[in-house]
Amino acid sequence: DELAGKLTAKWIKIKTAEREHRYVPDIDLSPYYVYREEESQNSVVPYTKEDFLGEVYMSEESYDTLVALLKNKKNLILQGAPGVGKTFAAKRLAYSLIGEKDDSRIEFIQFHQNYSYEDFIMGYKPQEQGFKLTNGIFYRFCMTAADHPEKDYYFIIDEINRGNMSKIFGELLMLIEKDYRGTKATLAYSSTTFSVPKNLYM
């Protein structure tokens, strides 16, 4: 019951066929990402403010306040005791602002004590032939948002208090602020410049 409404699963159907008195399993082994792609192409589920208020224990006034703050500041922190549904509410807040359940415009990560700039922005990762400069999850998501300026994107960080913000964000810590969106900074591991797009909300 605790997982109701939180997980979406695509079950693999298993059928059996009788042959020479033996049962041979006929198993659909299509990769999960194929199902995910089919679902994203064939089913667009609308999601409204009313849907949010029906799923999240929050008043309409509080919802309107959250929306106004997020649109104005670009960044929003939800604070509360563990297990009260902050992450659940954050994702559905994003859904309601997008207007549909479009997970391609939402990214979710969880910070921990060992999370680093190399994981988040950019860094060298071990490969078979040595080390390779690899883009982190925040960098990639920002690039996606920058390529589609007509759409809003939402980056959700769970357990943000467990991470070392200065260590993880590095020179980009200031760039997530509203007044510095679009301002370019040179990345530590490359000579390229980078900015946090204005259509990305955190």
Regions found by a protein language model. Name each.
Residues L3-K49:
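Contiguous surface segments at macromolecular interaction interfaces
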